[in-house]
């Protein structure tokens, strides 16, 4: 395990909402919710910390957010402006290193092992970047500093907002033992439920399990979780990263025959894929359905749409059509997956922020 890298994960604090509060004094100190009209279909893209005190969070339906926070201010937001500010932040990063891996508009990995300023301390680099962003742009960022990307990302969320958390190689395993497994990369709702049923709530619980037992229970997720909780993870920051597809799949605890259960899974996947596509500022044209039967036979079917989309309904309808054409109901399904590929950037004026 290489522990020599110095990696920073920078995560802007409530980015879209913070930009709006910076630019519009009337929003400051008030519960601001970006996600469109609460009387129409929509999902919260992000919200200010004032709104979060009421239980509002990203990916929540705007109608639910309005019930939790009746005095909330709802706006659609301005994606083109957020992109502009994100580029300004990226320029600040580039003063320290060219090894930058953006994850979205508001977060990125930086490898500062050999940085342009010749600074030996990654902690000092992170602190200086935070200060520069605040001084020049009037925005706050949180930072995680460690020797691999997985730990740095978890650490950046530890002291929000405007915090900095450093995890050295010597501290890594103890740090990870206290973290809820729901914070681990790749642990979604389904995996979290499986872990809960197994009595695994924290990294410490996870660490008690052997690699083989985790793989048996959780398949590939088990392999990755075994490595993550021991601080063994990818430490290569990739400045050329570009997502070619966005997808979601799950292995059922019990084999499934009921097509309605499969359709429900596809709807959940379509919502998650839409959320990821919008965060990446992309839309896609090809929907791919993956089915694995109880005998481990795997098929994939794809449908290319007439136009690009990042809309839940359109993605689901295409996937459901593929399911109806592919699945007879005679053999049980072990795994189902949905992927959108053939991606390209979204034009700002067409971005469906209100539908995140």
Curated annotation (Swiss-Prot):
Residues 1-188 form the UmuC domain. The active site is at 107. Binds 2 magnesium ions per subunit. It catalyses: DNA(n) + a 2'-deoxyribonucleoside 5'-triphosphate = DNA(n+1) + diphosphate. InterPro entries: DNA/RNA_pol_sf, DNA_pol_Y-fam_lit_finger_sf, DNA_pol_Y-fam_little_finger, DNA_polymerase-Y, DNApol_IV, PolY_HhH_motif, Rev_trsase/Diguanyl_cyclase, UmuC. GO terms for cellular component: cytosol. Gene3D superfamilies: 3.30.70.270, 3.40.1170.60, 5' to 3' exonuclease, C-terminal subdomain, DNA polymerase, Y-family, little finger domain. The keyword tRNA processing does not apply. The keyword DNA repair applies. Keywords: Cytoplasm, DNA damage, DNA repair, DNA replication, DNA-binding, DNA-directed DNA polymerase, Magnesium, Metal-binding, Mutator protein, Nucleotidyltransferase, Transferase. Poorly processive, error-prone DNA polymerase involved in untargeted mutagenesis. Copies undamaged DNA at stalled replication forks, which arise in vivo from mismatched or misaligned primer ends. These misaligned primers can be extended by PolIV. Exhibits no 3'-5' exonuclease (proofreading) activity. May be involved in translesional synthesis, in conjunction with the beta clamp from PolIII. Belongs to the DNA polymerase type-Y family. This is DNA polymerase IV.
């Amino acid at each position: 395990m290489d522990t020599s890298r110095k990696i920073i994960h920078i995560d802007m604090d409530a980015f879209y909402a913070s930009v709006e509060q910076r630019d519009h004094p009337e929003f400051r100190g008030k519960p601001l919710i970006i996600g469109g009209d609460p009387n129409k279909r929509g999902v919260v893209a992000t919200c200010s910390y004032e709104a979060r005190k009421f239980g509002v969070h990203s990916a929540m339906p705007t109608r639910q957010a309005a019930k939790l926070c009746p005095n909330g201010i709802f706006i659609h937001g301005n994606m083109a402006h957020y992109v502009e500010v994100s580029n300004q932040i990226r320029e600040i990063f580039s003063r320290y290193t060219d090894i930058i891996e953006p994850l979205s508009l508001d977060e990125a990995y930086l490898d500062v092992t050999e940085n342009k300023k010749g600074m030996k301390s990654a902690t000092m680099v992170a602190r200086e970047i935070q200060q520069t962003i605040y001084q020049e742009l009037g925005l706050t960022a949180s930072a995680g500093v460690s020797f691999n990307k997985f730990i740095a990302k978890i650490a950046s969320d530890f002291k929000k907002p405007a915090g900095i958390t450093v995890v050295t190689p010597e501290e890594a395993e103890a740090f990870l033992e206290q973290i809820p497994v729901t914070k681990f990369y790749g642990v979604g709702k389904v995996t979290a439920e499986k872990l809960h049923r197994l009595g695994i709530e924290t990294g410490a619980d996870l660490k008690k399990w052997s690699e083989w037992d985790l793989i048996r229970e959780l398949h590939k997720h088990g392999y990755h979780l075994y490595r993550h909780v021991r601080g063994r993870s990818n430490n290569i920051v990739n400045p050329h990263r570009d997502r070619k597809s966005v997808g979601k799949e799950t292995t059922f605890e019990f084999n499934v025959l009921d097509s309605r259960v499969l359709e429900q899974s596809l709807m959940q996947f379509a919502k998650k894929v839409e959320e990821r596509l919008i965060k990446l500022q992309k839309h896609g044209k090809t929907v791919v359905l993956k089915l694995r039967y109880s005998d481990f036979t795997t098929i994939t079917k794809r449908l290319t749409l007439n136009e690009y989309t990042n809309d839940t309904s359109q993605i689901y309808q295409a996937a459901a059509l593929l399911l109806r054409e592919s699945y007879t109901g005679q053999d049980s399904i072990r795994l189902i997956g949905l992927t959108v590929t053939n991606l390209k950037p979204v034009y700002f004026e067409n971005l469906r922020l209100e539908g995140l």
